């Protein structure tokens, strides 16, 4: 059967999965002719991180808009450390070894690493065992062992598998975590570090340590003079190799950013190189242009193009995170430029300004006071948010005077009008900007149900962004927009 032509392929957006799906911490891997994403699984309206079992999504490498859900691939109930069967599972990673796919993960409030396996990349996976020392002691349980967290696995070209792990924070945050564990009545003594992450080799059985854990990237207490200052390791270890360079990808102490370091070796001599992605677009913009918090992901090469996968935050908390992806530019020396937050993400180019789009693909979202860290302390009465209704239909809520909603990028060709579908508590106006030019105004009347509002615009043929700026005392919900 012939492959799809460009005209047959749908467009890809951010987030790249359906609006009702919440799979953060995405580790992308290409197996044969498909890219698979393995991540945590948040619950809409959940009260904490990772409340759902693991699912897997994949897409053909030639059509990154065509994602398939393979359903629940692992529940963790078979894990002998999951005594109640109700423990949550944090960020996983997967590696293939001799035709078997191994899923590495950690349970909540755990200091160990568990492993499940399958003969297919999409699972289902069955419990296999726990990573352990040569004497059989589970890693994390021996006296002096560091806490294990966010395992990343990497198979080198010679077949050797490396395991990366670690959570490294400030003393203040560590104290808060320990108090939270005590408050929950858990009798767990976790050795949390401030000195970065660890690397170790695995034996052929994928469970036994071939080498003891050694430090890799520095944390806040040992970064002086290393070049990592201000971007020390926090969590989310991931390793990749492209051409002759190894890339250690991680989330820094700043939380919102995915950083990277480079080396000629997978287990030593890494030099800090920069930021790959910020879910607040910090670094591309001087101030955040989207509500930001923790980030986790990695790089994948697909059909000769590099992409960084991460996640964004929605619904006024850090517990409903959605996967996003952006193109990366590799420089001649192997370094990458930071990726800008966009709405087009995995698309082959800018989106076509000639059809309907859902509002939730916004990559710019902020109140008149700007954007801030997404957590329970933020003023939900002031700030807009992406959320969903009882039918799992996504929309932007709490749009008020000064709210800015933006999309990047569109290919404008002969566009003469723009429409939005909204509800509004009062009459108001939306200014429409393309680039820095105001191209039209939407006059929105009070409407209790979704109503389409259209205005004529004067737009030159170009590739550019789209921004709506609300003026007036109305509070709105925003479902979708369209061109012509």
Over which residues does each language-model region extend?
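Carbohydrate-active catalytic/glycan-binding domains of CAZyme proteins
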Residues: 1-441, 445-484
């Amino acid at each position: 059967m012939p492959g799809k032509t460009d005209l047959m392929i749908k467009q890809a957006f951010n987030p790249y999965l359906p609006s009702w799906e919440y799979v953060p911490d995405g580790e992308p891997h290409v197996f044969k002719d498909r890219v698979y994403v393995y991540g945590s699984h948040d619950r809409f309206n959940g009260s904490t991180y990772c409340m759902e079992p693991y699912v897997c999504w994949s897409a053909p490498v030639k059509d990154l808009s065509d994602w398939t859900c393979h359903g629940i691939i692992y529940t963790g109930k078979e894990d002998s450390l999951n005594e109640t069967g109700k423990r949550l599972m944090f960020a996983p990673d997967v590696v293939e070894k001799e035709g078997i796919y191994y899923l590495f993960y950690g349970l909540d409030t755990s200091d160990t690493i568990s492993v499940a396996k399958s003969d297919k990349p999409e699972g289902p996976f069955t419990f296999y065992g726990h990573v352990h020392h040569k004497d059989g002691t589970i890693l994390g349980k021996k006296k002096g062992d560091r806490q294990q967290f966010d395992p990343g696995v990497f198979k080198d070209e010679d077949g050797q598998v490396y395991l990366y792990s670690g959570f490294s924070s400030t003393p203040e945050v560590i104290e808060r975590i320990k108090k939270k564990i005590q408050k929950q009545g858990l009798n767990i003594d976790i050795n949390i570090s401030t000195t970065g992450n660890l690397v170790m080799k695995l034996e052929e059985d994928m469970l036994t340590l071939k080498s003891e854990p050694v430090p890799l990237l520095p944390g806040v207490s040992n970064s002086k003079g290393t070049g990592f200052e201000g971007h020390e390791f926090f969590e989310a270890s991931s390793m990749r190799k492209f051409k002759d360079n190894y890339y250690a990808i991680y989330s820094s102490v700043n939380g919102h950013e995915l950083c990277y370091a480079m080396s000629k070796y997978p287990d030593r001599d890494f030099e800090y190189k920069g930021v790959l992605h910020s879910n607040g677009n910090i670094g591309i913009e001087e101030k955040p242009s989207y509500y930001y918090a923790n980030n986790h992901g990695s790089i994948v090469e697909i059909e000769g193009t590099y992409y960084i996968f991460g996640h964004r935050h929605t619904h006024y908390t850090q517990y409903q995170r959605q996967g996003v992806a952006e193109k990366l530019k590799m420089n001649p020396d192997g370094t990458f430029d930071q990726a800008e937050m966009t709405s087009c993400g995995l698309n082959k180019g800018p989106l076509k300004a000639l059809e309907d789009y859902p509002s939730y693909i916004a990559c710019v979202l902020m109140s008149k006071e700007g954007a801030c860290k997404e957590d329970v302390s933020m003023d939900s009465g002031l700030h807009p948010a992406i959320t969903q209704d009882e039918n799992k239909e996504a929309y932007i809520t709490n749009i008020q005077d000064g709210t800015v909603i933006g999309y990047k990028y569109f290919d404008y060709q002969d566009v003469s009008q723009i429409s939005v579908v909204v509800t509004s508590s009062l009459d108001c106006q939306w200014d429409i900007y393309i680039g820095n030019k105001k191209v039209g105004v939407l006059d929105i009347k009070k409407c209790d149900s979704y109503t389409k509002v259209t205005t004529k615009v004067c737009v030159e043929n170009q590739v550019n962004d789209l921004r709506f700026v609300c003026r007036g005392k109305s509070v709105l919900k925003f479902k979708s927009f369209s061109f012509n």
